Every structure is written in structure tokens, then in C-alpha cells.
Amino acid sequence: MNTLKMQRRIAAEILKCGENRIWIDPERIDDVASAITREDIKRLIKEGVIKKKPIKGQSRYRAKIRHEQKKKGRHRGPGSRKGKKTARMGKKELWIKTIRALRKELRKLKAQKKIDRKTYRMLYIRAKGGQFKNKHQLYLFLEEHGLLKK
């Protein structure tokens, strides 16, 4: 049996694709084997004996399912994590999250008149300095120093 290597190469050049994407009709292999010029190959392409196969894509089916599961909070356990804690949530992001929560709490306390303006400002600056890791520590400090008004 003929390998049709030359015909395949010429067809690939004409159809502007790789040699692996060339389909040759198995019924008309003898016609293709006798084709030696570019014109012969072009004629066979026109007749539909030689065709260009479609590109094989990469299926997103499994990826979509996995993404849906991740949206539900699955696949996020310690065994699935790669990289440090800071790689998953940056230090700055974490700081912003913490400081916003503290400042919101301070504003709430000031609005409820549980702390005065002077105390608010002092606590605001201490929060900015990183004295409080979370709201719990803020409240511990307030109780320790008797700064909360009843």
C-alpha cells in the first residue's frame, strides 16, 4: 500500500494545515496515489477526496463541573491547597479585611455613644498600628481599661 506522504504534504500546504489533519478517502486511494502535481491535488480537494479534518478542541466539561463544585465550596480542603497561606490570600488583602472590620466596629461604638470621640481616635490609631488582631482583642482592651460606657 502507498504511504501517500508526498500527496499528504502537498495537500497540507494547499489547505494550510498540518499533515495529520489531512483526510484521504479510503475508497479513492489509487486516484490520490496517481496525483503527482499540485493541480492534481487541488482537483481531488475540489472533488472531496481530500479534506481537512476539524481541529480537536479541549473539552471544558469536567472543568465546568469542577468550577461549579468550587463555587459551592468543595475541593478547598487542606489536601487541595498548594502554596502558602499568604499565596492564597495576600498579606495586604488580609490587613485590609481586618482593619475594615475594626474601623466599622469603632464607628458603630461611637454612633451608639459607647465611646467618646477622644477614645475613638485613640483606638483608631492603635488599630492602625496593628495593636488589635481582631474585634475580640479590641473588646478585651476596652473592658480591661474600662473605656466602654454603659
UniProtKB/Swiss-Prot annotation:
PROSITE patterns: RIBOSOMAL_L19E (PS00526). GO terms for cellular component: cytosolic large ribosomal subunit. It comes from the Archaea. InterPro entries: 60S_ribosomal_eL19_sf (IPR035970), Ribosomal_eL19 (IPR039547), Ribosomal_eL19_arc (IPR033936), Ribosomal_eL19_CS (IPR023638), Ribosomal_eL19_dom (IPR000196), Ribosomal_eL19_dom1 (IPR015972). The keyword Oxidoreductase does not apply. GO terms for biological process: translation. GO terms for molecular function: large ribosomal subunit rRNA binding; structural constituent of ribosome. Signal peptide: none annotated. Residues 55-89 are annotated as: Disordered. Binds to the 23S rRNA. Part of the 50S ribosomal subunit. This is Large ribosomal subunit protein eL19. It comes from Pyrococcus furiosus (strain ATCC 43587 / DSM 3638 / JCM 8422 / Vc1). The gene is rpl19e.
